[in-house]
Amino acid sequence: MAKGKDVRIRVILECISCVRKGANEESTGISRYSTQKNRHNTPGQLEFKKFCRYCRKHTTHHEIKK
């Protein structure tokens, strides 16, 4: 039987370059990736280098709050 909340949760990673660019200029969109993380192993926020199709390069993607 499972105890308490689920250990694995779904998180959304968002490109920080698109978010910053969107405030200053007109942006075509914001790159987002969906993934899972284990709360016990990674209690902090996730940060990955992933490909952003709007920036057309590999950029840092941070976990966003729901």
UniProtKB/Swiss-Prot annotation:
Q: Where is the signal peptide?
A: none
Domain of life here? Eukaryota
Q: Check the record and name the InterPro entries matching this protein.
A: Ribosomal_bL33 (IPR001705), Ribosomal_bL33_CS (IPR018264), Ribosomal_bL33_sf (IPR038584), Ribosomal_zn-bd (IPR011332)
Sorted alphabetically, the keyword list is: Chloroplast, Plastid, Ribonucleoprotein, Ribosomal protein
Per the record, a Pfam family?
Ribosomal_L33
The cross-references to Gene3D superfamilies, in alphabetical order and at most eight, read: Ribosomal protein L33
The compartments listed are: Plastid, Chloroplast
Example of a GO MF term? structural constituent of ribosome
What is one term from the GO cellular component aspect held by the record? ribosome
Q: Name one GO biological process term.
A: translation
Establish whether keyword Plastid is in the entry.
Answer: yes
- What family is reported? Belongs to the bacterial ribosomal protein bL33 family.
This protein's name: Large ribosomal subunit protein bL33c
Organism, per UniProt? Triticum aestivum (Wheat)
Q: What's the encoding gene here?
A: rpl33
